[in-house]
Curated annotation (Swiss-Prot):
InterPro entries: Ribosomal_bL19 (IPR001857), Ribosomal_bL19_CS (IPR018257), Ribosomal_bL19_sf (IPR038657), Translation_prot_SH3-like_sf (IPR008991). This is Large ribosomal subunit protein bL19. This protein is located at the 30S-50S ribosomal subunit interface and may play a role in the structure and function of the aminoacyl-tRNA binding site. The keyword rRNA-binding does not apply. GO terms for biological process: translation. GO terms for molecular function: structural constituent of ribosome. Belongs to the bacterial ribosomal protein bL19 family. Coiled coil: none annotated. Keywords: Ribonucleoprotein, Ribosomal protein. The gene is rplS. One of its GO terms (cellular component) is cytosolic large ribosomal subunit. Pfam families: Ribosomal_L19 (PF01245). PROSITE patterns: RIBOSOMAL_L19 (PS01015).
Length: 115
């Protein structure tokens, strides 16, 4: 049974996604349906966590919009994501960056690494 589940989910996995980690800044292009129209909405922010594995893997992106922190969690392998761009790679020592929620302004900056 487990083997069958793995085979089915393997077909659903996306291979066109870039490698990214917590601390990286991403630009996520999301397909949004409004009435009978479909458009692309861009959400840019810092990855604060990645969790799960396989088809159920998710990642959370945080940005500050008009002074308010906004976090959005995306399933990694969803067809709703048109594309993901890595804007910059950040150097962090944690897998979950929940501490960024408490920091404001320059304190919330993440050191950039060149790859």
């Amino acid at each position: 049974m487990q083997k069958l589940i793995e085979e089915i989910t393997k077909e659903q996995l996306r291979t066109d996604l870039p490698a990214f980690r917590p601390g990286d800044t991403l630009r996520v292009h999301v397909k949004v349906v409004e009435g009978n129209r479909e458009r692309i909405q861009v959400f840019e922010g810092v990855v604060i966590k990645r969790r799960g594995g396989g088809i159920s893997e998710t990642f959370t992106v945080r940005k500050i919009s008009y002074g308010v922190g906004v976090e959005r969690t995306f399933p990694l392998h969803t067809p709703k994501i048109a594309k993901i761009e890595v804007v910059r790679h950040g150097k962090v020592r944690r897998a979950k960056l929940y501490y960024l929620r408490e920091l404001r302004g320059k304190a919330a900056r993440i050191k950039e690494i060149r790859r």
